[in-house]
């Protein structure tokens, strides 16, 4: 069986709700928002993989040393090429970048774009969103590395968590 897989950082349910509420109040755009249950930050994209590759990914992730990670989100952005409105960290995060690059190297993944941490808010956007309220100001303490499967449904694409590996909690959180 084939699976469309990626590794990412999932938001907790209350964080997804906070982000969805902010998005509904702060952004004006004619295109519908991404399903809030899909909010996540992609670290490594595998594409289509079979069951044996899925098993290998799970095994490697179980053995992987994982860092404590947090991100402060405050930058609204737009990529015209992929027609995506997104929220990005307001400051570079070396630990996050290093971890994503380590995952890509471990799984020998090549991507034509460098790692650019973000949470997609609107897809199929022909133009940027207009900010009509306060800018975003979210600090997220990431709880787990998550292996997701992307599935097409009648309601649109949905991301299903197949496995989670806890991340350590830092001694102190700094934005």
Residue map of PLM features:
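Histidine-dependent nucleotide/RNA phosphoesterase domain, centered on the 2H-phosphoesterase fold
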Residues: 1-175
């Amino acid at each position: 069986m084939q699976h469309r897989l990626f590794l990412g950082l999932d938001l907790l349910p209350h964080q997804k709700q906070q982000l969805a509420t902010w998005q509904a109040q702060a952004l004006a755009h004619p295109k519908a928002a991404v399903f809030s249950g899909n909010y996540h930050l992609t670290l490594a994209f595998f594409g289509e993989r079979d069951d044996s590759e899925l098993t290998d990914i799970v095994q490697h992730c179980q053995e992987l040393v994982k860092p404590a990670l947090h991100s402060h989100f405050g930058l609204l952005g737009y990529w015209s090429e992929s027609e995506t409105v997104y929220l990005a960290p307001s400051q570079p995060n070396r630990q996050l970048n290093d971890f994503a690059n380590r995952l890509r190297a471990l799984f020998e993944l090549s991507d034509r774009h460098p790692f650019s941490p973000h949470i997609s808010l609107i897809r199929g956007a022909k133009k940027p969103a207009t900010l009509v309220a306060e800018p975003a100001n979210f600090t997220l303490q990431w709880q787990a590395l998550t292996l997701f499967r992307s599935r097409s449904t009648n309601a649109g694409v949905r991301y299903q968590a197949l496995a989670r590996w806890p991340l350590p909690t830092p001694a102190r959180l700094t934005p």
